[in-house]
Each structure stands twice: as structure tokens, then as C-alpha cells.
Swiss-Prot record:
Keyword DNA damage: no
Organism classification: Eukaryota, Metazoa, Chordata, Craniata, Vertebrata
Top-level taxon in the UniProt lineage: Eukaryota
Gene: st6gal2
PANTHER family: BETA-GALACTOSIDE ALPHA-2,6-SIALYLTRANSFERASE (PTHR46059), BETA-GALACTOSIDE ALPHA-2,6-SIALYLTRANSFERASE 2 (PTHR46059:SF3)
A Pfam family per the record: Glyco_transf_29
Catalytic activity: a beta-D-galactoside + CMP-N-acetyl-beta-neuraminate = an N-acetyl-alpha-neuraminyl-(2->6)-beta-D-galactosyl derivative + CMP + H(+)
Transmembrane residue ranges: 11-31
Organism: Takifugu rubripes (Japanese pufferfish)
Name of the protein described by the UniProt record: Beta-galactoside alpha-2,6-sialyltransferase 2
Length: 537
């Protein structure tokens, strides 16, 4: 009897122990499932943001990239982006979903599923902001590449702040030291990559990401080449050259060694403003002569024998302008040019609040998310729109098939607001600027229109006696934040894939008359207006 009771107690204890173990196992399972729940769940507020969905799709697709063949559209050569902490503008405004719904938010979306991989290719203008270095998702802060990059940024800040008359010499020594350090890191990464199956992809990409600081330093010195880009972006450039969407056929001379004065005079001759004025077909038959502004842009504020303005500021949308404190300096100019949907409200301390001219690409007019007809961004300013057109200047083809339909919204806006100066750049003007870039570059550049930034700079050099350009060539504040007003980060927003940004910036640096300290500390380039350049022509 006692033996039976003792055995029963043992069975009860074993059963209780089994239930406890089962409970712990179930608890552990559900806790792990909760911890591992991706940010892209439908319950995540972050994932409700359309840009975040695109970025998550790109990141998730990295494992499939080796299955993607070479495509003319290039999207497969562009890289994943990643989100971090939100940018902190001077007044720390609230970030609205609308502000980040720009079509410029990602180069493409790649979706993997049971039926294979599907890619949504974004338009060329969207690719403008997603262009420089090929990058993977960056790992932890213990990564030697990240630590090296952080040390570089800190060293530049302290060295520039405290050195005196020996500034240039010490900076060159620091740059050389950093380049040697980066090379050591690169050798280690190459060796690591070589030991792994598949070779040189992810670790070597981190190396190219770490080189972004030294690339900017070379840009400060005016030394640029496509070899500075990652292999991924070099392939992208080659594919764009092969695709040649706009049928570009350059037959001009190559003069990469022109002096600053010679380059300025060539720019002055080629960059004569030309707008769609309604005198050419098909616009003349559509009555555009009475639709466009009667006064040319260069005569809006014309003074006798001078440019329209004495001093002008071109404010790019780069994230590096955050925490610059340049707002008051920017607003002190006679005229200020801004781009696309870049706001000023909430960012006044860094970017100012004056806007005289706003250059907008055709997406702004065509995409209802930009609220072109209702947003205050596009009111009480001079508007200049542009859209890529064939290199052959076939206006009939352009009108019938623009990249984005800007013509209908333009006509509607002009009829509703006839007193607001609103122009469309003639394709001849845009492609002449491209000819200048290619003619002064030994390498073959992308056969795509220049960026809005380059167009805006040359436009203001026509209208102003002196032009200050902010953060077109990055300062020591260089950041992975693509735009100061949007919440996405990528190292691929500096030197271009679709637009020939690398070569554009090299040309601007060649004609920069400002001191090197302005470029490093403020990201400011000083350029003479064309009216002040004597070319004897």
C-alpha cells in the first residue's frame, strides 16, 4: 500500500514538472516571437509610412540581388537605405507623413515572393537624390569602418576649429593620415572578404562607405574620377551610358584642363537663359505666346548694366545644412533660390526663410502629393520648372511624352495666377549645360540632364553679381541624411548615379573663388556672376 502511494506521488511530481517545463517553453516561444517581430508589421506606426515600406523592401531584398541581371534602368545597382534617428532641425518641427511622401524617397522597391522578384523602378528624377556610394546596411557601432568614419568627422571638427595660420598644412597632413588609415581598413576588409565564399561584396562595400569622407576631401581639392565610386555605382554609370535614354551624341571638344577663367567664359557663352516662350512649335499653335510671362526672367529685377541682383544664395536641400546656423547669413542676400519641396518653416536657423526663386522638376507639378496648387511653398515666388527632353531637342516628342506631364498643370496655373512669374526652361538650355560638363571632363559622363542644383547655380550666375552656394559641395558636416527635411539616410545622396553630379561639383569647385575654410566649415562656394566676368567676346 505504501509502495503504491509513494509511486503515485512520484507520478504527480513528474506530471507537475512536465507542466512547468511546457509552460516555460510556451512562454519562451511567445516572448521570442514578440522580440523578433519585424518593424514592418502592420501594427507598426513606422511601417505605415510609405517611404519606410520601400526602404524595408529594399533591405529585405538584398539577399536576392545576386539573382538580378544587369538592366538598363539601373535600379538593381542601387543600394539599400536605412533609417536612424530623425533629423533634428533648429526648431525641431514635427515630421508629417506628407513631408516624407516625396517620390524622391527611394530609387526602387524590390519585392520578393513566391512568384519571384518584382521591381518597381522609380523615375530618373527620383534617382537624383539616391545616387552616390554603393552601400549595404551598416552594422553595429563597433564596426571598425564606422569607428574610423566617426574619428575622421571628429578630427576634422577639432582641427578646423583650433588651428591658426597653419590650417592648410595641417589639414593636408590629416587627410593623408586618414587616407592611410582607410587603406589599412580596406586591406583588412579585402582579406576578410577574400576568405568568405562569394568574395568581395558586403565587407568591401563597407570599405567604400567609409571612404566617403576622403572622397569629399578630394572633391574639395578638385580631384575626381569615377574610380572614387564603389564598384556598384561604377557599374550603374556604365549602364546609364549604355542605355542612353535621351539619345545623347556629344561631338564637341574635350578640354578638361581649362583655367578657371576659360571655364567661366565657356559657361557664360553656353548658359544664356532660354525659356519656353511660345514661339516654337508645337507651343505656338497652342497659344503659348500669350500664356507665358511677357517679361523674361533676367529682366524681372534688372538694373542698368548690372545683373538683376548683387548677392544671391543657392540653398541646396542637403542634410548637412542642419545645425549650420546659416539662416541669418542666407537671408542677408538680395535673392535666395531653393529647390523643389524644400521647406523653410521650422528650419529658419539653418536655412533662413527668404525665397525669391524656386526651381521645381516636373514631378512637383504632376504628383498630387506635392499639393502644387495649394501649398504655400509655391506662392509669392518666381517659379522655374524643367523636365528632361531628348538631346535632339525634338519639342513635339517632348510635348507628347514628357517624363512627367508638366504642361497641363503649367497652363492651368498660368491661367489661375497670371501675375505670378512662372517659366519652363527650354531643353536647349539644359543640354547646353550638359555639354559644358562633358566638354570639361575627360571621362564619359552620364548621358542624362544635369541636376537641379547645377541648373540653379548657373541660372543664378546669370542673374546675380555674386553667388554663394550652400552644401552643394559638402562641408565637414557631411551626413548620410539625404535631405534636411526628410527622414531617410543613405550615403548615396552626394555624388550621383543618374545625374553627373560628381563632375558637376568638380566644375563648380574649379571656379570657386572663396577660401577653403568656407567650404570646410560652411559648405559655401563663392562664384562670380557672369556680368562680372570679362571674356572679350
Amino acid at each position: 500500500m505504501k509502495s503504491w502511494v509513494r509511486q503515485g506521488r512520484r507520478l504527480v511530481l513528474v506530471g507537475m514538472l512536465a507542466w512547468v517545463l511546457l509552460f516555460l517553453a510556451l512562454l519562451s516561444y511567445f516572448l521570442d516571437a514578440r522580440v523578433n517581430e519585424p518593424l514592418t508589421s502592420t501594427g507598426s506606426v513606422l511601417y505605415q509610412h510609405p517611404d519606410t515600406r520601400r526602404l524595408a523592401s529594399i533591405q529585405a531584398s538584398q539577399l536576392h540581388n545576386t539573382n538580378l541581371g544587369s538592366r538598363p534602368e539601373l535600379a538593381s545597382t542601387l543600394t539599400a537605405t536605412y533609417t536612424r534617428d530623425e533629423p533634428r532641425p533648429s526648431a525641431t518641427p514635427e515630421f508629417s507623413l506628407e513631408a516624407s511622401q516625396s517620390p524622391d524617397s527611394a530609387p526602387l522597391a524590390i519585392y520578393g515572393g513566391p512568384e519571384g522578384i518584382h521591381q518597381d523602378y522609380l523615375d530618373p528624377q527620383s534617382l537624383a537624390a539616391w545616387s552616390s556610394f554603393g552601400t549595404e546596411n551598416i552594422g553595429s557601432q563597433s564596426d571598425p569602418v564606422i569607428q574610423s568614419r566617426e574619428r575622421t568627422s571628429q578630427n576634422h571638427g577639432s582641427i578646423t576649429r583650433y588651428r591658426g595660420g597653419e590650417e592648410e598644412e595641417e589639414e593636408e597632413e590629416e587627410e593623408e593620415r586618414q587616407e592611410n588609415e582607410d587603406e589599412d581598413v580596406a586591406n583588412g576588409l579585402r582579406n576578410t572578404a577574400a576568405r568568405k565564399p562569394g568574395g568581395d561584396s558586403s565587407e568591401l562595400e563597407k570599405y567604400y562607405f567609409s571612404k566617403s569622407i576622403s572622397v569629399v576631401q578630394r572633391l574639395w581639392r578638385g580631384h575626381v574620377s569615377a574610380d572614387m565610386l564603389s564598384p556598384r555605382l561604377q557599374r550603374a554609370m556604365k549602364d546609364y551610358v549604355s542605355a542612353n535614354k535621351h539619345q545623347v551624341s556629344y561631338r564637341g571638344r574635350r578640354r578638361p584642363s581649362q583655367s578657371a577663367k576659360e571655364l567661366l567664359c565657356e559657361m557664360k557663352a553656353q548658359a544664356r537663359l532660354q525659356m519656353v516662350d511660345g514661339t516654337q512649335q508645337p507651343f505656338s499653335s497652342l497659344g503659348w505666346a500669350s500664356l507665358v510671362p511677357s517679361l523674361p526672367l533676367e529682366q524681372l529685377h534688372k538694373r542698368p548694366d548690372q545683373g538683376s541682383f548683387k548677392s544671391c544664395a543657392v540653398v541646396t536641400s542637403a542634410g548637412a545644412i542642419l545645425r549650420s546656423g546659416l539662416g541669418r547669413e542666407i537671408d542677408a542676400h538680395d535673392a535666395v533660390l531653393r529647390f523643389n519641396a524644400a521647406p523653410t518653416e521650422g528650419y529658419e536657423r539653418d536655412v533662413g526663410n527668404k525665397t525669391t526663386i524656386r526651381i521645381i522638376n516636373s514631378q512637383i507639378l504632376a504628383n498630387p502629393n506635392h499639393r502644387f496648387n495649394t501649398s504655400s511653398l509655391y506662392k509669392d515666388v518666381v517659379l522655374v520648372a524643367w523636365d528632361p527632353a531628348p538631346y535632339t531637342l525634338d519639342l513635339h516628342k517632348w510635348y507628347a511624352s514628357p517624363d512627367y506631364n508638366l504642361f497641363g498643370p503649367y497652363m492651368e496655373h498660368r491661367r489661375a495666377h497670371p501675375d505670378q512669374p512662372f517659366y519652363i526652361l527650354h531643353p536647349r538650355y539644359v543640354w547646353r549645360l550638359w555639354d559644358v560638363i562633358q566638354g570639361n571632363t575627360q571621362e564619359n559622363i552620364q548621358p542624362n540632364p544635369p541636376s537641379s542644383g547645377f541648373i540653379g547655380i548657373l541660372l543664378m550666375m546669370t542673374l546675380c553679381e555674386q553667388v554663394h552656394v550652400y552644401e552643394y559641395i559638402p562641408s565637414m558636416r557631411q551626413s548620410d541624411l539625404c535631405h534636411y527635411h526628410e527622414r531617410y539616410y543613405d550615403a548615396a545622396c552626394t555624388l550621383g548615379a543618374y545625374h553627373p553630379l560628381l563632375y558637376e561639383k568638380s566644375l563648380i569647385q574649379r571656379i570657386n573663388t572663396g577660401p577653403g575654410s568656407d567650404l570646410r566649415r560652411k559648405g559655401r562656394v563663392t562664384l562670380p556672376g557672369f556680368s562680372t566676368v570679362d571674356c572679350d567676346i
